[in-house]
């Protein structure tokens, strides 16, 4: 019985690729050094899979930055601003597209479906001259072959590539990107022909767009593309891989009738309805790549349940045509549990990172072919049983409190406009009040203090003294700049989710559970393994200390429940919304303690609320309902005079604006500076938003210092669609990643712009 892996993490078990990339970018190592580290990583991954008994091992899933960017390079679709003049695309052009350079900005980066990975968006139009400009797929196939490993080269499919693209600057938004299919297919044919010549017998096209809600003309593009490729693909086995959700009945019909295709890959972890489609109709003689091992989480597979699913499928597709596979690439999970020496043994026994998941895939394939490893299956069953019965997982008080939430929608008793009046009487803020989003620059010295405290190299007393000095510096700076509502700067926090997770029960943390977010940037999601509660106050000590240093309002700073959920590895033994409600109750306790401590402005960040939106429109309402409800739970009990802020980190709100209004926050600040018009257009079209709103006036992701007049002009544009009594003036995000040399003048200009507009408004009366 055959086994298959859709894709594997690239960073290496100890983030070797990250450090090699950053060393190369900083000019501390050569291109050859980077290539050597990368070749060693690829070789160890291929050998690991071969040794584990995997039959269909992927190649070309490694990337120096991103697989969609690799496809852009393969097709020679380099935007003109990068000055590429043809020939094989090398690191200089490749990394300029990914990261920008001294003279030109990077290409846009956006989220890969509903994961926390980001891809580089192709910029296309009728003028693009496509040409075969990166032979990476063929070179990596040959590289593996030279090591004695026959692999399945993986390409981003042609239709998904075009549907993931955007119209280049200056190209009309009505331009149909799919009209470029006839221009890119000849290059795909060249790549396929070279792979065939190099000895490839299988090839994998990733077409994840098939899980989206697609109009019929888009589905027809798949049929047309593969019909065109059919003669080139003859003599090869071809698998078309989908992942992250169910395929619709229409997409399934399209997929199983594609010309030249031998097998189909499905996510059977998130795609439970797809299973019914397969059982109802599957083309005879074709292969089913059954994605039963979860590529997006870190829990051990329920091998007995997966085996039962696979045995049922055997009857449908035939024993020799069923391939045990993964739900998606392992890019979205951590690399190897072997490096977790500090994780609690019991919790560790419940987990499987990518390296362990490879073994699970192989164990299932062997069991199907009558060679079941009884010891492996028994150990798995014992781990699952221990997880189910462990007292660490279940907290009855939490379960009871969460159950009691049902039946109420947890709204504050009064309207937002009457609350804002009460808050204004208490806070006495000027018109167009200024604030920042929360974090201030994290200096090398500050990181050292935190690291030494964690390693017990300095005492708690020394740590508190150092953090107190930092808070005092940040408060003083904001007073000198004349900012109206202050923040403490978050010097005690390394990460906005980890900081809270470390103080909540039900969370565990890995040492090396890194997952690629984009380029060399990795994140280490907390693991939510059990019921969540708050044993002690988490932020009250620091917020109270900061408030005692100033007469101005000091914001309490919390991360919201939906963001904590969406940026964690979440337990899979209960629905996500139940876990979210538990986190909401823990945050509610904190909000109430901050209020008691005299904090009158409390910000509950929901940076990732939109990120959790399901891929299919039919599932949006249910998600938004519980996500928004979770937010309201956190602050339902506070007084009218306590002002609740929230912050959101993305530009495309238009489709969820009514849910944002339904959150019932008093003030919302938004990461908006890069897409001004997009957001303001919602309000221009007459959506009445009665609460305070602070669309970011400048982009903190850039070191550029915006001049006062530019900021004043931006505020004027906002005042054209928003009432002056609800508009706040703030940067678009936290300042953690910037330097003080950039932050001070930028904030100074921001305050000056707000004061200028106050004068203009006063003289216009």
Swiss-Prot record:
Compartment list: Cytoplasm
Enzyme Commission code: 2.1.1.14
GO biological process: methionine biosynthetic process; methylation
Matching Pfam families: Meth_synt_1, Meth_synt_2
Catalytic site: 701 (proton donor)
Binding site for Zn(2+) 1: 647, 649, 671, 733
Function field: Catalyzes the transfer of a methyl group from 5-methyltetrahydrofolate to homocysteine resulting in methionine formation.
Binding site for Zn(2+) 2: 658, 662
Species of the source: Mesembryanthemum crystallinum (Common ice plant)
Pathway: Amino-acid biosynthesis; L-methionine biosynthesis via de novo pathway; L-methionine from L-homocysteine (MetE route): step 1/1
Protein name per UniProt: 5-methyltetrahydropteroyltriglutamate--homocysteine methyltransferase
Keywords: Amino-acid biosynthesis, Cytoplasm, Metal-binding, Methionine biosynthesis, Methyltransferase, Transferase, Zinc
Residues that bind L-methionine: 437-439, 490, 605
Entry binding sites for 5-methyltetrahydropteroyltri-L-glutamate: 18, 116, 495, 518, 521-522, 567
GO CC, one annotated term: cytoplasm
Sequence positions that bind L-homocysteine: 437-439, 490, 605
InterPro entries membership: Cbl-indep_Met_Synth_N (IPR013215), Cobalamin-indep_Met_synthase (IPR006276), Met_Synth_C/arc (IPR002629), UROD/MetE-like_sf (IPR038071)
Position of the signal peptide: none
Family: Belongs to the vitamin-B12 independent methionine synthase family.
HAMAP family: Meth_synth
Catalytic activity: 5-methyltetrahydropteroyltri-L-glutamate + L-homocysteine = tetrahydropteroyltri-L-glutamate + L-methionine
Molecular function terms from GO: 5-methyltetrahydropteroyltriglutamate-homocysteine S-methyltransferase activity; zinc ion binding
């Amino acid at each position: 019985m055959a086994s298959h892996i859709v894709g594997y993490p690239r960073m290496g078990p100890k983030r070797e690729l990250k450090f090699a990339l950053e060393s190369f970018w900083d000019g501390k190592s050569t291109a050859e050094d980077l290539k050597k580290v990368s070749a060693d990583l690829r070789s160890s991954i291929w050998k690991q899979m071969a040794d584990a008994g995997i039959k269909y091992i992927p190649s070309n899933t490694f990337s120096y930055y991103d697989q969609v960017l690799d496809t852009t390079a393969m097709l020679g679709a380099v935007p003109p601003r990068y000055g590429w003049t043809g020939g094989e695309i090398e690191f200089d052009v490749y990394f300029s597209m990914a990261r920008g350079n001294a003279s030109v900005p990077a290409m846009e980066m956006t989220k890969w479906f509903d994961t926390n990975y980001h891809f580089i968006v192709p910029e296309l139009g009728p003028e693009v001259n496509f040409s075969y400009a990166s032979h990476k797929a063929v070179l990596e196939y040959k590289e593996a072959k030279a090591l004695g490993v026959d692999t399945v080269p993986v390409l981003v499919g042609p239709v998904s590539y075009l549907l993931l693209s955007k119209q280049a600057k200056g190209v009309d938004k009505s331009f149909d990107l799919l009209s470029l299919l006839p221009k890119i297919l000849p290059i795909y044919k060249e790549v396929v022909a070279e792979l065939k010549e190099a000895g490839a017998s299988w090839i994998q096209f990733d077409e994840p767009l098939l899980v989206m809600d697609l109009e019929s003309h888009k589905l027809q593009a798949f049929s047309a593309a593969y019909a065109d490729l059919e003669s080139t693909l003859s003599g090869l086995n071809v698998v078309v891989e989908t992942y992250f959700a169910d395929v619709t009945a229409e997409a399934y019909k399209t997929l199983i009738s594609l010309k030249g295709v031998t097998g189909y890959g499905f996510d059977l972890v998130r795609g439970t309805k797809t299973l019914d489609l397969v059982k109802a109709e599957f083309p005879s003689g074709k292969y089913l790549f059954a994605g039963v091992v979860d590529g997006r989480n870190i829990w051990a597979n329920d091998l007995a349940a997966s085996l039962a699913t696979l045995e049922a499928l055997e009857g449908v597709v035939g024993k020799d045509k069923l391939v045990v596979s993964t739900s998606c690439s392992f890019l979205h999970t951590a690399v190897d549990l072997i490096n977790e020496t500090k994780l609690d043994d019991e919790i560790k026994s419940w987990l499987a990172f990518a390296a362990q998941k490879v073994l699970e895939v192989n164990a299932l394939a062997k069991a199907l072919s009558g060679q079941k490893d009884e010891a492996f299956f028994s150990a798995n069953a014992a781990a699952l049983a221990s997880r189910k019965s462990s007292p660490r997982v279940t907290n009855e008080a939490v379960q009871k409190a969460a159950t009691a939430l049902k039946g109420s929608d947890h709204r504050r008793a009064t309207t937002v406009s009457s609350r804002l009046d009460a808050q204004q009487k208490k806070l006495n803020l000027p018109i167009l009040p200024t604030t920042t989003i929360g974090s201030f620059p994290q200096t090398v010295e500050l990181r050292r203090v935190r690291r030494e405290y964690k390693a017990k190299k300095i005492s708690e007393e020394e740590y508190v003294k150092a953090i107190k000095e930092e808070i005092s510096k940040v408060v003083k700076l904001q007073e000198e700049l004349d900012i109206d509502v202050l923040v403490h700067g978050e010097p005690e926090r390394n990460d906005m989710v980890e900081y809270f997770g470390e103080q909540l029960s039900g969370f565990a943390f890995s040492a090396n559970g890194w997952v690629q977010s984009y380029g060399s940037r990795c994140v280490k999601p907390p693991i939510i393994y059990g019921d969540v509660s708050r044993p002690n106050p988490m932020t009250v000590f620091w917020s109270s200390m900061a408030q005692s240093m100033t007469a101005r309002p000091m914001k309490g700073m919390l991360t919201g429940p939906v963001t904590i959920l969406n940026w964690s590895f979440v337990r899979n033994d209960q629905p996500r919304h139940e876990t979210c409600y538990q986190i909401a109750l823990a945050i509610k306790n904190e909000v109430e303690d901050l209020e008691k401590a005299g904090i009158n402005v409390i910000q509950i960040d929901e940076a990732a609320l939109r990120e959790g939106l399901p891929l299919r429109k039919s599932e949006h309402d249910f998600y938004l309902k519980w996500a928004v409800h979770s937010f309201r739970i956190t602050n339902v009990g506070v007084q009218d005079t306590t002002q609740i802020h929230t912050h959101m980190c993305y530009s495309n709100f238009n489709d969820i604006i009514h849910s944002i209004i339904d959150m019932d926050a008093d003030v919302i600040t938004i990461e908006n500076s890069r897409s001004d018009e997009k957001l303001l257009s919602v309000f221009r079209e007459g959506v009445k938003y009665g609460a305070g709103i602070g669309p970011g006036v400048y982009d903190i992701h850039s070191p550029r210092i915006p001049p006062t007049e530019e900021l004043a002009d931006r505020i004027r544009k906002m005042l054209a669609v928003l009432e002056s009594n609800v508009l706040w003036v703030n940067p678009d995000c936290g300042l953690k990643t910037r330097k003080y040399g950039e932050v001070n003048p930028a904030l100074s200009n921001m305050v000056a712009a707000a004061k200028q507009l106050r004068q203009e408004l006063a003289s216009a009366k």
